[in-house]
Amino acid sequence: MDWLLAGLGNPGAEYARTRHNAGFWTLQTLADRVGASLRMEKRWHCLAATARASGLELGLCMPQDFMNRSGGPVQAMAAFYKVAAERILVMHDELDLPPGAARLKRGGGHGGHNGLRDLDRALGTRDYWRLRIGIGHPGHKDAVIPYVLSAPPPADKTLIDEAIERSLGVLPDFLCGRTDAAQKSLHSD
């Protein structure tokens, strides 16, 4: 397997439309594009699939634990397929970017994101790639939890969907090793 792509979010219908599920939205859109059917894989506790795209074998992982327990499923699938951390791309919501923005980044801190914090712990490293999908910030730290656990207004959802589209548009360059070109294209929007 060439890459493991993981989308972070919270499982269940009550969370499906919340901002915190931007990673799920991104991975599901990708799965639909490459014709992959995500199915429950009990041994990893995630919805999983394999697919071929851009001449590469991809693993798709959507953890079915809550956000703060995302690391275990991603680590388990990565270990099974012997995928090194630097070949993992984690798609997640990002408070520090406005709706409509997206960024590719390797490594770094978790910035208070509990899904990334758990991934750092489970993988034993921060040296994995992140696709950060902007959801905006509510303005005050005390408002963060209700903000990420609520649905964005339609205008913001449209911007988030556009960022997901642009992100998936640069994914072939990224996966084939043209990371600078992918970042330049995505970050210039």
From Swiss-Prot:
EC number(s) per entry: 3.1.1.29
Any one GO cellular component localisation term in the record: cytoplasm
Positions marked as site (Discriminates between blocked and unblocked aminoacyl-tRNA): N10
Chief location category: cytoplasm
Site residues (Stabilizes the basic form of H active site to accept a proton), renumbered to this chain: D93
Family of this protein: Belongs to the PTH family.
Protein name: Peptidyl-tRNA hydrolase
Organism from which the protein derives: Acidithiobacillus ferrooxidans (strain ATCC 23270 / DSM 14882 / CIP 104768 / NCIMB 8455)
